[in-house]
Amino acid sequence: MSATGPGIVVIDKPAGMTSHDVVGRCRRIFATRRVGHAGTLDPMATGVLVIGIERATKILGLLTAAPKSYAATIRLGQTTSTEDAEGQVLQSVPAKHLTIEAIDAAMERLRGEIRQVPSSVSAIKVGGRRAYRLARQGRSVQLEARPIRIDRFELLAARRRDQLIDIDVEIDCSSGTYIRALARDLGDALGVGGHVTALRRTRVGRFELDQARSLDDLAERPALSLSLDEACLLMFARRDLTAAEASAAANGRSLPAVGIDGVYAACDADGRVIALLRDEGSRTRSVAVLRPATMHPG
C-alpha cells in the first residue's frame, strides 16, 4: 500500500503520453496498483489530469462527470481523418475569406445547450469495441448525437496562414464534450472544415492547472495534491454526523435526508469523510463508502 495514503494528484500531462501511461508512472511512484484517472486526455493533449490513489479511486467517476475547461487552437480550412493534427488531411478548402465576425457568429451558434456527435476516434464503445479502433481500421463509425453544454466558447486570437486560419479559443463545457468534434462542427458551419492542432485542459471541476505538477517533479518529490478527505470537502458540500449516524453510514445504511442538493460528504466528529451520500426522498442513498466499518481505524 502507498505510504502516502489515499488522495488526489493533479498532473500536468505532457504531450505524447496516453492517460494510461500517466497512471502507470504514478503506480510506480506511489508503489501501488490502485491508481486511476478522471477523464481521458488524448496523447497530443496536455494539461490537467486528475489521478486517484488508493481509496480515492472511488470518487473518480464523480470527477469524470465534472465540468471542464480547455484552451485550444483550431485550424479552419482543413478536415482530417482524426479531427486533430495527427490524422491525414482529407480535404482542404480556402478559408482566407472568413472574417472574425463570421467566425464568432458561427461560434455563438455552438454555445449553450446543443447536441454533439462525438468524434469518430473517441473511446465510446460501438458493438463492444472502441470507436477509435474501428475508425483506424477504416471502418465506418456511426455515433449518436448527445446533449452537451458549452458555457463559454471564446475567440482569443486569429492567425492567417496562406489559405488557412488558425484560431486560439477557450472553452468551458460539460462533461462528455469532445473538443475535436467542436472544431469539426465549427469548420462545417463555416463551410471550410476544421480540426484541432493544439489542446490543453485547464480545469476539471475544482482542480485547475495552477495546482498541477509535472511527472518529473512528482517522481522527485512524491506527494499527494490533496488527501481523500481534503478532495471530498473541496468537491462536495459537508454534512456532520453523530456517532450513531457515522456508524450507520460506515455500514452502508441509509440516514434521514437533510435537504442537501446533489452528492455530499458525510463526516464523523473528527472531520473524516465516512461516505458520500445523496438525498433521495426522505432518506439518503450511499454513493460511496470511503471508510467502511470493516476498515482499520485511521
Swiss-Prot record:
The cross-references to InterPro entries, in alphabetical order and at most eight, read: PsdUridine_synth_cat_dom_sf, PsdUridine_synth_N, PUA-like_sf, PUA_sf, tRNA_psdUridine_synth_fam2_C, tRNA_psdUridine_synth_TruB, TruB_C
Source organism's superkingdom? Answer: Bacteria
Which Gene3D superfamilies is this protein grouped with?
A: Pseudouridine synthase, PUA domain
Give one Pfam family, short name only: TruB_C
Family, per entry: Belongs to the pseudouridine synthase TruB family. Type 1 subfamily.
Q: Which reaction does it catalyse?
A: uridine(55) in tRNA = pseudouridine(55) in tRNA
**Biological role:** Responsible for synthesis of pseudouridine from uracil-55 in the psi GC loop of transfer RNAs.
Instruction: List the active site.
Output: 42
Q: Which gene encodes it?
A: truB
- Keyword Isomerase present in the record's keywords: the answer is yes
Q: What is its EC number?
A: 5.4.99.25
Per the record, its GO cellular-component terms are: peptidoglycan-based cell wall
Does this UniProt record's set of keywords contain Zinc? no
Which intervals of the chain form a coiled coil? Answer: none
What keywords appear on the UniProt entry? Isomerase, tRNA processing
From the Swiss-Prot or TrEMBL record, give the protein name. tRNA pseudouridine synthase B
Q: GO annotations under biological process?
A: mRNA pseudouridine synthesis; tRNA modification; tRNA pseudouridine synthesis
Q: Which PANTHER family match?
A: PSEUDOURIDYLATE SYNTHASE TRUB1 (PTHR13767:SF2), TRNA-PSEUDOURIDINE SYNTHASE (PTHR13767)
UniProt GO MF annotations: pseudouridine synthase activity; RNA binding; tRNA pseudouridine(55) synthase activity
